[in-house]
Amino acid sequence: MARSIVVLGAQWGDEGKGKIVDWLTSRAQYVVRYQGGHNAGHTIVVDQQKITLHLIPSGILHNHVTAVIANGVVLSPFSLIKEMKMLLKLGVSTCKRIFISASCPLLLPYHVAMDLARENHHISKAIGTTGCGIGPSYEDKVARRALRVSDLYNLKYFKNKLKDVVDYYNFQLVYYYKTKPINYQIVLEEVMSISDILIDMVVDVPELLDDAAKRGDSVIFEGAQGSLLDIDHGTYPYVTSSHTIAGSVSVGAGVGLNYIDYVLGIVKAYSTRVGFGPFPTELSNDTGNWLCMNGNEFGSTTGRRRRTGWFDAVSVRYSVKINSFFSCCLTKIDVLDGLKELKICIAYRKKNGKVIHNFPCSLEELENCVPIYEILPGWMISTVGITEFHQLPKESQLYVKRIEELIGVPIHIVSTGSDRSAIIILRNPFDS
């Protein structure tokens, strides 16, 4: 029986991971974020109430679950406190239920200022980031100048290091980007006002998770963004600044490879992408607009409209390879209700006419690929809220089975709506 389950997106993010993590954690004791930051936007709908979490793991909505933010996450302390207050207003207790790693790099206002300055300065070369400061924060980590949660234990050291880092950023912000400098004193005072809260939440994450395994507790690792946005394996440079694939769990949470029992890929029934970058199956027509509006495809972090397109089996098959998914969950199939026909991309045609079935690693090559489609019949019957596979329209069942064949792994879960109860379980990962 699976005890440790990794849940991550197989596309460009926004696949519906939050709902599935929320569902899985009904049988788990711990839920762990291991990469990314508050650029994530994981939405759960409980009793028609929409709750969006950016930093705190989605499983926190279950009172028996302990939420952990591990070392691979760049931690915005202000976003964390804001989210905790939001949960308290909703009646969700966070006391002694949220823990953080002392090794988390702190994401502070100068990271946000730099992120926005770069995007505005190089508009023609913009990546389309969320503007949350994620990239600059990871840069500091790699350059070994990041302030970490552990630095808060030594106030004198923290003050001196913060001054050096603020000076470093202000030189660039003022003299290169021609924008306003960051006020060191304000940043210091803001961090100091919540430092005791952060220190009280610190735990030895590898030790905590090791003890959990010894007790036989179940742990859900919640990925952010999607596999095609991985800094190494995604559509570089139009990617996020962290590793989003399954292998990053070990580094980002401090657990060995043998700790992981199961990897579940989350796949949307069509494709979406936020920001810039190649998108072979993108639809810039009425169908694309219909998918956007019917699927409410607007970013939960930025509010930006998502680009939409047909399901791309080539890219998802690539995600299956680099993650070794045990199975997949197909989400938002209900969004396709009412379409007379559906298309699935089964291959790409290159500029020279050659047909390829593998996802290109070259950005230029991918940008010049044209999708080759297989057409399937749509369905006119609503699938919203269906909980048994045999109750789905036959055309819908065919669509699920065809995707399963094309991506090479079984689909064990199908989501049929935004509510946590709108779900079809063909095989529970915990029972695998």
From Swiss-Prot:
Principal cellular location given in the protein's record: cytoplasm
Pfam families cross-referenced by the UniProt entry: Adenylsucc_synt
Enzyme Commission code(s) on record: 6.3.4.4
Enzyme's top EC category: ligase
Details of cofactor binding: Binds 1 Mg(2+) ion per subunit.
UniProt xrefs under InterPro entries: Adenylosuccin_syn_GTP-bd, Adenylosuccin_syn_Lys_AS, Adenylosuccinate_synth_dom1, Adenylosuccinate_synth_dom2, Adenylosuccinate_synth_dom3, Adenylosuccinate_synthetase, P-loop_NTPase
Localization per record: Cytoplasm
PROSITE patterns given in the database record: ADENYLOSUCCIN_SYN_1 (PS01266), ADENYLOSUCCIN_SYN_2 (PS00513)
Metabolic or biological pathway: Purine metabolism; AMP biosynthesis via de novo pathway; AMP from IMP: step 1/2
A cellular component term, taken from the record's GO annotations: cytoplasm
Sequence positions that bind IMP: 14-17, 39-42, 130, 144, 225, 240, 304
GO MF entries: adenylosuccinate synthase activity; GTP binding; magnesium ion binding
This protein's UniProt keywords: Cytoplasm, GTP-binding, Ligase, Magnesium, Metal-binding, Nucleotide-binding, Purine biosynthesis
Residues at the catalytic site: 14 (proton acceptor), 42 (proton donor)
Functional note: Plays an important role in the de novo pathway of purine nucleotide biosynthesis. Catalyzes the first committed step in the biosynthesis of AMP from IMP.
Self-association and partners: Homodimer.
Protein name: Adenylosuccinate synthetase
Organism lineage: Bacteria, Pseudomonadati, Pseudomonadota, Gammaproteobacteria, Enterobacterales
